[in-house]
């Protein structure tokens, strides 16, 4: 028995040693992604239609998208969200209940909003579903009853958020980063919502729900020659109108890094956000390096911020970084909800990790793991009709090369540690960052003042105030 045990142990150790000496398998060949090019036509009113035939499954999706410029709602902030919530409740031709019952009966899915509409169904019902989509989108039934109901919901939501630290923090982040006179910086209040009338909803819809910058993407088991006359019949009467061109101030980053503090006496932890604005288009050379750098900084639980703030320090359940992109100004935000007693220390560690990705090359292994994750998610997404529709729209609206998504994997694989560092130095503005903190001032201000970072104080709506005085 003893000899048998020794023999098994020797065989076990030998197996381990052989496994260690065995060369690691080489990475497999990157998958080839073939994205079918859409067939297109444009209606006289400006609506651009893209059709991608795919007869593998008997399903069709329709995606109507409006690519309008952001606009300022001003003293009636909330009019667009109210309209967004009201559209889709039937149409002027079909009552709400009958509309919804027919959709359910056909086993379809239809969603409407102020920026477009989406529908999916079995291909044998596609003609009727497209008709319902056109009906709901182009002939919405805005009634006083629905208006009062949706307005009451929004007002209730605003009241519920009055003392919510995350809600206060998010509002102030947007207001300070973009400015309150910018579409991304203005916020809805009880007063601005009360200013909105049913007539405003209708006017806003007629002003911005227009075919000038609209796209209809159709994907699935449908034939171009058959769907083209149907689209022309349903959408050809959509009145041709242009959206107004509105000017608003461009956001400006602060001239020096500073703490912008919001005192929230009921806070049990501090909401910390490091924010700067940027212009990053999907077609830019640094798009992929910037996106991947952001993921390395705070994209998952193995990111720099999480390994420090969560795993090492135990101050938070999680931290994250997000970077915006597109035709319009966006923001980079690194954020976390931190235990109050560690607020000042967390600020130091945030800065440390951002400085690290700007000054130290990321390891090749870590970079390869992150790239592999991106590629894996892309390959999974590319199988979905919604993704194909989004890719087709992006190529048009973001003015991307026609082969942007065919080269997606190759472009990601080409990103190097030097690219990451270059992008981080360009977009992670360590010397021009707002460190926006919403927390209990009586507990955290003394520690923050010791950091020798200039501090400015704001109320929960982003208005400058004096430093709080505590007895």
What does each of the following model-derived ranges do?
Residues 4-13:
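Sec-dependent N-terminal signal peptides
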Residues 21-28, 215-280, 437-471:
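An aromatic/glycine/proline-enriched structural segment found at the starts
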Residues 23-41, 175-214, 225, 242, ...:
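Histidine-acidic residue clusters that define the catalytic metal-binding segment
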Residues 26, 100-204, 250, 367-386, ...:
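Acidic/histidine-enriched segments that form metal/cofactor-coordinating
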Residues 46, 64, 81-83, 103, ...:
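Buried hydrophobic packing residues in well-ordered domains
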Residues 63-123, 186-187, 299-315, 328:
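M16/MPP (pitrilysin/insulinase) zinc-metallopeptidase core fold and M16-derived inactive scaffolds
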Residues 90-93, 120-151, 281, 300, ...:
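M16/insulysin-pitrilysin zinc metalloprotease superfamily fold
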Residues 153-172, 250-269, 307-316, 360-413:
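Short acidic/His-enriched helical or mixed secondary-structure segments at domain edges of catalytic enzymes
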């Amino acid at each position: 028995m003893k000899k048998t045990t020794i023999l098994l142990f020797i065989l076990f150790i030998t197996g381990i040693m052989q496994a260690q000496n065995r060369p690691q398998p080489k990475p497999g060949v990157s998958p080839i992604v073939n994205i079918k090019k859409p067939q297109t036509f444009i209606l006289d009113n400006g609506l651009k239609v893209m059709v991608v035939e795919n007869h593998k499954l008997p399903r069709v999706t329709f995606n109507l998208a409006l690519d309008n410029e952001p606009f300022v709602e001003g003293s009636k902030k909330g009019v667009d969200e109210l309209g967004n919530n009201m559209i889709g409740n039937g149409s002027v031709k079909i009552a709400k209940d009958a509309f919804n019952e027919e959709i359910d009966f056909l086993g379809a899915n239809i969603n409407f909003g102020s920026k477009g509409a989406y529908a999916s169904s079995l291909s044998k019902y596609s003609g009727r579903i497209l008709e319902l989509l056109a009906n709901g989108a182009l002939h919405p039934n805005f009634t006083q009853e629905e208006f009062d109901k949706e307005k009451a919901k929004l007002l209730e939501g605003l009241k519920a958020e009055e003392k919510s630290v995350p809600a206060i923090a998010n509002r102030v982040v947007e207001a300070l980063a973009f400015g309150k006179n910018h579409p991304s910086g203005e916020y809805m209040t009880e007063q601005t919502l009360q200013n909105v009338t049913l007539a405003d909803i209708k006017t806003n819809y007629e002003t911005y729900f227009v075919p000038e910058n609209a796209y209809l993407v159709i994907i699935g088991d449908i034939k171009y020659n058959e769907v083209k006359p149907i689209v022309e019949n349903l959408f050809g009467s959509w009145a041709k109108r242009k959206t107004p061109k509105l000017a608003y101030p461009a956001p400006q980053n602060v001239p020096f890094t500073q703490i912008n503090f919001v005192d929230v006496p009921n806070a049990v932890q501090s909401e910390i956000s490091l924010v700067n604005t940027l212009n990053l288009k999907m077609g830019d050379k640094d798009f992929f390096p910037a996106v991947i750098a952001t993921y390395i900084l705070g994209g998952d639980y193995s990111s720099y911020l999480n390994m420090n703030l969560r795993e090492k320090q135990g101050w938070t359940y999680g931290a994250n970084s997000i970077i915006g992109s597109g035709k319009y100004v966006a923001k980079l935000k690194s954020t976390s909800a931190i235990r109050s007693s560690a607020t000042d220390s967390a600020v130091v560690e945030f800065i440390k990790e951002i400085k690290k990705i700007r000054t130290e090359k990321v390891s090749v292994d870590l970079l390869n793991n992150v790239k592999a994750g991106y590629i894996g998610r892309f390959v999974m997404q590319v199988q979905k009709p919604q993704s194909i529709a989004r890719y087709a729209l992006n190529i048009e609206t973001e003015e991307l090369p026609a082969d942007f998504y065919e080269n997606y994997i190759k472009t990601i694989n080409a990103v190097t540690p030097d690219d990451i560092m270059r992008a981080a130095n360009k977009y992670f503005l360590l010397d021009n960052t707002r460190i926006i903190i919403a927390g209990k001032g009586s507990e955290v201000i003394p520690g923050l003042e010791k950091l020798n970072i200039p501090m400015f104080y704001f109320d929960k709506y982003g208005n400058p105030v004096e430093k709080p005085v505590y007895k």
